[in-house]
Amino acid sequence: MEAPPVTMMPVTGGTINMMEYLLQGSVLDHSLESLIHRLRGLCDNMEPETFVDHEMVFLLKGQQASPFVLRARRSLDRAGAPWHLRYLGQPEMGDKNRHALVRNCVDIATSENLTDFLMEMGFRMDHEFVARGHLFRKGIMKIVVYKIFRILVPGNTDNTEALSLSYLVELSVVAPAGQDMVSDDMRNFAEQLKPLVHLEKIDPKRLM
């Protein structure tokens, strides 16, 4: 899920190599309210946002060993909101002492014909899902707590069922390359959420 709503970073000129710093965990349904209460106390003094997003994952298979993956996401509860196209690179295998997973991140707002464009480019949809949850902010950190729903009839986002009896929890920061000190702040924040949820540096390859 990578699945939560995405942030937009304005670029005034040139190219900025943005990186996503990420910690992940999960919490059972019956512990959700306790976690939300804790986050309200720790995060910025504003009401958390709620979201209902539809995400489609597209693959482009070529001669390379693994397909090229792009994610198209749209809001189901905010009429007129732009589609988002997101690319997430492979996790960096750098400093073992780095407290968060780090990967390249490209996120752009697009027009509503995004999926048609991707299909014309040769991409094929691999899977789709609906994500429902809450978004909190603490400075530059973003915390999302959300549940993933399976779409039972392709394309029909009204016909879904929960994928599990738990909520995913993600703590992330999007920053220019080289800002590794943010992972220290993330670790310190994650410590304050224990024992309700344990946020960890999880390598997606280990889940495959």
Curated annotation (Swiss-Prot):
Main location: nucleus
One annotated Gene Ontology cellular component of this protein: core mediator complex
Subcellular location, record wording: Nucleus
InterPro entries, alphabetized: Mediator_Med18
Keyword Transcription regulation found: yes
Phosphoserine: modified positions: 66
Gene Ontology annotations of biological process type: positive regulation of transcription initiation by RNA polymerase II
Domain of life according to the entry: Eukaryota
UniProtKB keywords: Activator, Nucleus, Phosphoprotein, Transcription, Transcription regulation
Gene Ontology MF term list: transcription coregulator activity
Keyword Transcription regulation: yes
Pfam families: Med18
Family as reported in the entry's similarity comment: Belongs to the Mediator complex subunit 18 family.
Subunit structure: Component of the Mediator complex, which is composed of MED1, MED4, MED6, MED7, MED8, MED9, MED10, MED11, MED12, MED13, MED13L, MED14, MED15, MED16, MED17, MED18, MED19, MED20, MED21, MED22, MED23, MED24, MED25, MED26, MED27, MED29, MED30, MED31, CCNC, CDK8 and CDC2L6/CDK11. The MED12, MED13, CCNC and CDK8 subunits form a distinct module termed the CDK8 module. Mediator containing the CDK8 module is less active than Mediator lacking this module in supporting transcriptional activation.
PANTHER family membership: MEDIATOR OF RNA POLYMERASE II TRANSCRIPTION SUBUNIT 18 (PTHR13321:SF2), MEDIATOR OF RNA POLYMERASE II TRANSCRIPTION, SUBUNIT 18 (PTHR13321)
Protein task: Component of the Mediator complex, a coactivator involved in the regulated transcription of nearly all RNA polymerase II-dependent genes. Mediator functions as a bridge to convey information from gene-specific regulatory proteins to the basal RNA polymerase II transcription machinery. Mediator is recruited to promoters by direct interactions with regulatory proteins and serves as a scaffold for the assembly of a functional preinitiation complex with RNA polymerase II and the general transcription factors.
Protein name: Mediator of RNA polymerase II transcription subunit 18
Organism: Bos taurus (Bovine)
Lineage: Eukaryota, Metazoa, Chordata, Craniata, Vertebrata
